[in-house]
UniProtKB/Swiss-Prot annotation:
Known function: Phosphorylation of dTMP to form dTDP in both de novo and salvage pathways of dTTP synthesis.
InterPro entries hit by this protein: P-loop_NTPase (IPR027417), Thymidylate_kin-like_dom (IPR039430), Thymidylate_kin_CS (IPR018095), Thymidylate_kinase (IPR018094)
Organism name: Salmonella arizonae (strain ATCC BAA-731 / CDC346-86 / RSK2980)
A cellular-component GO term for this protein: cytosol
NCBIfam families: DTMP_kinase
E.C. numbers: 2.7.4.9
Encoding gene per record: tmk
Binding sites annotated in the UniProt record for ATP: G10, L11, E12, G13, A14, G15, K16, T17
Protein name: Thymidylate kinase
Biological processes per GO annotation: dTDP biosynthetic process; dTTP biosynthetic process; dUDP biosynthetic process
Alphabetized CDD domains for the sequence: TMPK
Molecular function in Gene Ontology: ATP binding; dTMP kinase activity
Family (UniProt): Belongs to the thymidylate kinase family.
Lineage: superkingdom: Bacteria
UniProt KW keywords: ATP-binding, Kinase, Nucleotide biosynthesis, Nucleotide-binding, Transferase
Length: 213
């Protein structure tokens, strides 16, 4: 597929939108301008409807969404996005900048929900095969910092309303997975904004230049 799929990950309030802007600015400075943006869940008509179902606390009334149903909806949205948007773009040499991908499911559902990690890995491999982002920027914040920022933005979705314990488990799984995969780079997002932006620029620049070497 080529090395041009970059994903930004992190807890709520980690600063993914700002990070995306920095990534775009950095790529443009490196002469890369042909890019598209995606978000998960979402990014297609079907995936956006699934996003509403899984995140909008009012979407199914009083019905409780089970953990496994939640996982399957995330994967349904992801597969639709990957097959109809991301892969075709990559095949044409377009850079794809994604707000979340499969690492979110491994962290939120595997860590936060406590769903069996072997089952999640098996499901991922079955529906995505060996498709992975070329570079993932994981913005690491504590739940206390991240949720304070998220709550300042206004209404929280169904997952953003989870407990601190849920987000602590999610963060722990993020860190565990990041330590295992060299394609995942951890950025300390508790730093002042200028320092976070500097780290993102340096990471992306070094990575792009390394791909071209």
């Amino acid at each position: 597929m080529g090395s041009n799929y970059i994903v930004i990950e992190g807890l709520e309030g980690a600063g993914k939108t700002t990070a995306r802007d920095v990534v775009v600015e950095t790529l443009e400075q490196l002469g890369i301008r042909n890019m598209i943006f995606t978000r998960e869940p979402g990014g297609t008509q079907l995936a956006e409807k699934l996003r509403s179902l899984v995140l909008d606390i009012r979407s199914v009334g009083d019905e409780v969404i089970t953990d496994k149903a939640e996982v399957l909806m995330f994967y349904a949205a992801r597969v639709q996005l990957v097959e109809t948007v991301i892969k075709p773009a990559l095949a044409q040499g377009v850079w794809v900048i994604g707000d979340r991908h499969d690492l979110s499911t491994q962290a939120y559902q595997g860590g936060g929900r406590g769903i069996d990690q072997t089952m999640l890995a098996t499901l991922r491999d079955a529906v995505l095969g060996d498709f992975r982002p070329d570079l993932t920027l994981y913005l690491d914040v504590t739940p206390e910092v991240g949720l304070k920022r998220a709550r300042a933005r206004g209404d929280l979705d169904r997952i953003e309303q989870e407990s601190f314990d849920f987000f602590n488990r999610t963060r722990a799984r993020y860190l565990e997975l990041a330590a295992q995969d060299p394609r995942i780079r951890t950025i300390d997002a508790t730093q002042p904004l200028d320092a976070v932006m500097r780290d993102i620029r340096a990471t992306v620049t070094t990575w792009v230049q390394g791909q071209a070497a």
